Amino acid sequence: MPQKYFGTDGIRGKANVFPMTPDFAMKVGMAVGILFRSQNQSRRVVIGKDTRLSGYMLENALVSGFTAAGMEAFLLGPVPTPAVAMLCRSLRADLGVMISASHNPFYDNGIKLFGPDGFKLSDEIEEKIEQLIDTDLSKSLASCAEIGYAKRVEGDIYRYIEYAKRTLPRDVRLDNLRIVVDCANGAAYKAAPRALWELGAEVFAINDTPNGTNINHKCGSTDLASLKQKVHEVRADVGIALDGDGDRVLLVDEKAQTVDGDQLIAVIAEHWHKNGRLQSKGVVTTIMSNLGLERFLNSKGLDLVRTKVGDRYVVDAMRKKGYNVGGEASGHIVLSDFGTTGDGLVAALQILACMQEIQIPMSHLCQRFEPVPQIFKNVMIKNKNVLKKNPVKTAIEQATQRLGKKARLVIRASGTEPVIRIMGEGDEREMLDAVVTEMVDIITHHDTLSKACASLERS
């Protein structure tokens, strides 16, 4: 059943436009606080945020809601999303909240929720929260004597830095490595350069001066141009690109070539398998991961399990099936030996440690397989149910049959935008082009019909 407010990664939208308004954020805080207060003892919530201007507004609104429900709010300030998950466990909180829209522009924002174990909340709990939001919450708020309070937590970012460093053996240092790190003017602008420097690297930090509106703007994991330029300029061994909330990472090698999440997963999986650390003889990725990764892993005797798009689904599959490596091509890398969610800094450290151990350039280390050609198209839509229409479903089935087993067609609705995402993948480029173009035309046509029918109904 589709959820009313929650998408694939929490509640998200444009700041000061529903649902990212202060009054709705306060209601979310009340509903979540009431639910968790009734189930747990500590009544403690930790709240982090990235560097968006609207983070202050939403933070205060959430604090009002949580304290009205009787929760104690511990405010972390700007920290990466994985730091919230880690500190939720470390501070013995009932709940963790991250105010962020990840890789989106500054004018968007979102609310991500974590349970006391550091994992994102299940669909079932999110549904309960939605039901509470739509009720009269005033009758369930705390009494005057039980109203909660808020306090700033000092030194939390240094706890996260130490946590990230401890994912490497004590004898691993990054001496003699020249590293450029693009902080995306986001939540990791302090932690990432500091951790790399403390491990011995020569660090060049760029896009590390957030001003509230420059997060993810022509920088970070969604725009590698400035990172590639800096890597070339200072002759760096590697460039690291984080996103706005620090939960995803892409790399750039010494030749300024992009290394995506699939290649990072391949490196970690192969290295850990050789060292006996890889669990369940495989990894978990999504339907968007490249077929080349699957072929590479299979050639090593390893499995690849695919899930829906979203790191929460990757994590769910990892927990259920016992895998300890998972992720997405976009750069969400989940290593469950260390954490409960994607962590860009920790993933980058594992690659750097591998590079130091093997003593080969990044360009040799991180090109583990030849990617199969992929074509991506986004179709803006008005009717989010257009994929459920029989003519569209039939066309997709027929196109999939035409492509056969050596190619893939993935068509899905975005969980955060009014967009249908189409991905065609296979060795025959001309056929892929034709099939993807056909799908764009069919979806656009039936979405237009939906709009025409809606106009007739209104008239």
Curated annotation (Swiss-Prot):
One of its GO terms (molecular function) is phosphoglucosamine mutase activity. The active site is at 102 (phosphoserine intermediate). Its cofactor is Mg(2+). The keyword Hydrolase does not apply. The keyword Ribonucleoprotein does not apply. It catalyses: alpha-D-glucosamine 1-phosphate = D-glucosamine 6-phosphate. SUPFAM superfamilies: Phosphoglucomutase, C-terminal domain, Phosphoglucomutase, first 3 domains. Activated by phosphorylation. One of its GO terms (biological process) is carbohydrate metabolic process. It comes from the Bacteria. Mg(2+) binds at residues 102, 243, 245, 247. Binds 1 Mg(2+) ion per subunit. Belongs to the phosphohexose mutase family. This is Phosphoglucosamine mutase. The gene is glmM.
